[in-house]
Curated annotation (Swiss-Prot):
It comes from Shewanella baltica (strain OS155 / ATCC BAA-1091). This is Queuine tRNA-ribosyltransferase. Binds 1 zinc ion per subunit. GO terms for cellular component: cytosol. HAMAP family: Q_tRNA_Tgt (MF_00168). Pathway: tRNA modification; tRNA-queuosine biosynthesis. Keywords: Glycosyltransferase, Metal-binding, Queuosine biosynthesis, Transferase, tRNA processing, Zinc. The gene is tgt. It catalyses: 7-aminomethyl-7-carbaguanine + guanosine(34) in tRNA = 7-aminomethyl-7-carbaguanosine(34) in tRNA + guanine.
Length: 374
C-alpha cells in the first residue's frame, strides 16, 4: 500500500490509498461486510454506491466459515467476489463485546463461541494468521478495546498490554511474510497522556497506518472530539489515520475536520434495515404514516438507484409489508448518502472550501457547527 497526500484544508486531508487491487480516495468511508457480505447487497451494488473498499471481520469469519474454506477459495476477495481492497478488523473489539463469557490474559483471550459454546482461544499470532488467510489488504493488529468508563489506571494497563500485543502482531505478520499492510491501533481511553504513550510505542514498532480505537464506546461526543484533536496531529503525516467504528454523518464530518482519513460503521446499513434513512435534510423514518401517500423521492439531491426510481410511499409500503426489497432499497440509499457525503468532503478540501461545506451541512440539518479547539 502507498499513501499519497494531495492537499489539506485546515486539519482536513485529501489523498488516496493505492493498493494492487485498486485506489481508495480519502477521506474514505468503508461499508461493513461482517460475514463477507454487506447485508442484502451484491458486490456490484455496493460498488455502485461509490465504495472503494470494504471492511470484513476476522472474528466472525474465523468462526464461520473458517480458515480452511477461505483458503480453498483463495481468500476473502474470491470467496465474496469483491476484487477491490478489503480491511479486516482483528477481532479485538468483538471479543471485548462478549462481556462475561471471555477472559483476557497476557497470552490472549479465552472465550466460548457465541455460536455453539465451544471453548476458543484467540491471541495476536492467531489473529495475524487468520487475516493472512483472508488475504486482507489492510490487516489490523490484535488489541484490547479499552472500555468506557475506565479509570486512568485501568486504561493504562489495558493500553500497555495492547502495545505488547502490537509487538507480537508485528512479529507474526513479518514471520508470515504477509505482503500486505499492517495498521497499529492507538488506545488509552479518554486520557491524552495514555494516547501519547500508545502512539509513541506504536511508532517505535512501525506500522503502515494508525487507527484510533476505543472511541464511540459510550463516551461523550466532546471526549471523542478532544482525543481526536489531541492525537491526530501527532500521527506521522505520511501515514493514513483511521477512526474505527464511527459513525453518524456528523461524526464523519467532525472526524475529517480533525484530520481523519478513514472510517467504518454499521450505521448506514443497520439503520436502513430499521427504516431510518439519511437524507440531505436529516433523518427520515420511513415507517412513519405521513409517508404513506407521499409520491416524492426520498431525497431530491441523491442520485442513488432508490431515489431515481421509487417514491417514499413505495418505501413505506415495503416497510409495512416487511418486504426484503425494502431493506435492500433502503441500504442502497443510505450507503450512497454516506459516499456522497465523503465525495463532498473530498471536493471541499480540494477547493479550500471545507468551512463552507461544513456550515451548509449543519444548516441543512438545522444544527450549529461544533467548534474546533485551537
Amino acid at each position: 500500500m502507498k499513501f499519497e497526500l494531495d492537499t489539506t484544508d485546515g486539519r482536513a486531508r485529501r489523498g488516496r490509498l493505492i493498493f494492487d487491487r485498486g485506489t481508495v480516495e480519502t477521506p474514505a468511508f468503508m461499508p461493513v461486510g461482517t460475514y463477507g457480505t454487506v447485508k442484502g447487497m451484491t458486490p456490484e451494488e455496493v460498488r455502485a454506491t461509490g465504495a472503494d473498499i470494504l471492511l470484513g471481520n476476522t472474528f466472525h469469519l474465523w468462526l464461520r466459515p473458517g480458515e480452511e474454506i477461505m483458503r480453498k477459495h483463495g481468500d476473502l476477495h474470491d470467496f465474496m467476489n469483491w476484487q477491490r481492497p478489503i480491511l479486516t478488523d482483528s477481532g479485538g473489539f468483538q471479543v471485548f463485546s462478549l462481556g462475561d463469557i471471555r477472559k483476557i490474559t497476557e497470552e490472549g483471550v479465552h472465550f466460548r463461541s457465541p455460536i455453539n459454546g465451544e471453548k476458543i482461544f484467540l491471541d495476536p499470532e492467531k489473529s495475524m494468521q487468520i487475516q493472512d488467510a483472508l488475504g486482507s489488504d489492510v490487516v489490523m493488529i490484535f488489541d484490547e478495546c479499552t472500555p468506557y468508563p475506565a479509570t486512568e489506571d485501568e486504561a493504562r494497563k489495558s493500553m500497555q498490554m495492547s502495545l505488547r500485543w502490537a509487538r507480537r502482531s508485528r512479529d507474526e505478520f513479518d514471520r508470515l511474510e504477509n505482503p500486505n499492510s499492517l495498521f497499529g491501533i492507538i488506545q488509552g481511553g479518554v486520557y491524552e497522556d495514555l494516547r501519547d504513550e500508545s502512539l509513541k510505542g506504536l511508532v517505535d514498532i512501525g506500522f503502515d497506518g494508525y487507527a484510533v480505537g476505543g472511541l464511540a464506546v459510550g463516551e461523550p461526543k466532546a471526549d471523542m472530539h478532544r482525543i481526536l484533536e489531541h492525537i491526530c496531529p501527532q500521527i506521522p503525516a505520511d501515514k493514513p489515520r483511521y477512526l474505527m467504528g464511527v459513525g453518524k454523518p456528523e461524526d464523519l464530518v467532525e472526524g475529517v475536520r480533525r484530520g481523519v482519513d478513514m472510517f467504518d460503521c454499521v450505521m448506514p446499513t443497520r439503520n436502513a434495515r430499521n427504516g431510518h434513512l439519511f437524507t440531505s435534510e436529516g433523518v427520515i423514518k420511513i415507517r412513519n404514516a405521513r409517508h404513506r401517500d407521499d409520491t416524492s423521492p426520498l431525497d431530491t439531491k441523491c442520485d442513488c438507484y432508490t431515489c431515481k426510481n421509487y417514491s417514499r410511499a413505495y418505501l413505506y409500503h415495503l416497510d409495512r409489508c416487511n418486504e426484503i426489497l425494502g431493506a435492500r432499497l433502503n441500504t442502497i440509499h443510505n450507503l450512497r448518502y454516506y459516499q456522497m457525503l465523503m465525495e463532498g468532503l473530498r471536493g471541499a478540501i480540494e477547493t479550500g472550501t471545507l468551512d463552507a461545506f461544513v456550515a451548509d451541512f449543519y444548516t441543512s440539518q438545522g444544527r450549529e457547527v461544533p467548534e474546533l479547539v485551537d
